[in-house]
Amino acid sequence: MMYQPDREPGEDSCLVLSSSSVQRCTGSQRGCMPCTWAASKAFVGIGLQACVLTSSILHIDLLTRNSTCLILMIISMYVLSLIRVPISKMETIVTVCRSIQALATLVAASVWVAGSAVKKEHLLIVVTVCILFVFIAGTQISLFYVICSANGTGTHFRASLLAIIGGCVLGVSVKLVELKDVPIGIGIAIAIIASCQDFGLALRDTCHYRIGRYACMRTFTDLGRGINYRWVTDVEAVPKIEEVAEEKVSLFKFFKEMPGVIFSPAVGTHATPIIWIVLRLVYGISNVWQTPAYVVFCLTVGHVSAMLLEQLVIRVNYTAEASSGIHSTAHAVCMVLAAFGYGVAAPLSLAFTVSGGILGALYLRKRATGARRLAATHISRWLIVCVYVAAGLCYATIITH
């Protein structure tokens, strides 16, 4: 790590933040292929972890044949996303969770290999409990990865979002294949690979990430340990320097500053499953608009549209507020359409929920700089989880008979 004080911070030639684990890292803002390759592997790992999490949820549904379990698991993800844990403690939790995920996978694999030597009832119980542990551990790991990627550059965050949705689509494929030896073996291998490395830390230890964090925080400290300084005046109008630790920034300030960007997707998260339930009661299983394929399609379209609109919303004044109003209006229209029995309201509402949630997460992260970035990314993470919770609850309405 090298810093030349006689040059302006941010110039390409003045700042070198080399990785401590990536070999042949140049630490240059002009490009570093070893770190690009390391970051790419980290994104693959983040996607595989999302695949493991999605697959564990669907496996519990397949084993229990009870949509109540599926709904409870989805809601538990939502609750966990609301809890803010310091980064240092989160790193310890993730280390333990990776071990739990690997151990639970190995136990389930051992019971599966034993096959006929174990009673079917006992096998079902053991495998279900193991997959439940994989779900609990995988949720914590995935939440941590979102925070890590969101505190890098914008490219890191967008790439992680694409990796997550790609992993979710791969995990959903468990519903499309028959559970035989080869698919089960591949699933076990993916779970073990996802448990072998902390891909969040691997991403953070690339020069691109470190340079991006320095550009935001003006600090060489690792995530969660940064402190900014600002001038403030006390009651006697005497200026003084105040320390602002990124872990101490309140989340509630963002709710006051950008309420529409945050609450619009949150309302959509709650309204969309209601729309799907209403249409389910009207049409039953004959509604062609309510299928797992449409859930995946809406997730994909929502992600793509949000990323295409990101720069417009960030660069043009009042566009974010207008976007929130458009999404809220769309949800209101979808609710009216659902009340009159129009099935197309189901995919439209989910697509707008996904688009609003991802766009809100991207916008909120971009607007928060310095020590405020970490707190903002906790809200961004919650918005992203809201998107997948809405999609999961919509899927639950499909399989409920």
Curated annotation (Swiss-Prot):
Topological category with respect to the lipid bilayer: Multi-pass membrane protein
Subcellular location(s) of the protein: Membrane
Keywords: Membrane, Transmembrane, Transmembrane helix
Pfam families to which the protein is assigned, alphabetical: Herpes_UL43 (PF05072)
Coiled-coil blocks: none
Main location: membrane
Stretches that traverse the bilayer: 43-63, 67-87, 93-113, 124-144, 159-179, 182-202, 259-279, 294-314, 332-352, 379-399
Keyword Endoplasmic reticulum: no
InterPro entries: Herpes_UL43
GO CC list: membrane; viral tegument
Family under the similarity heading: Belongs to the alphaherpesvirinae HHV-1 UL43 family.
UniProt name for this protein: Membrane protein UL43 homolog
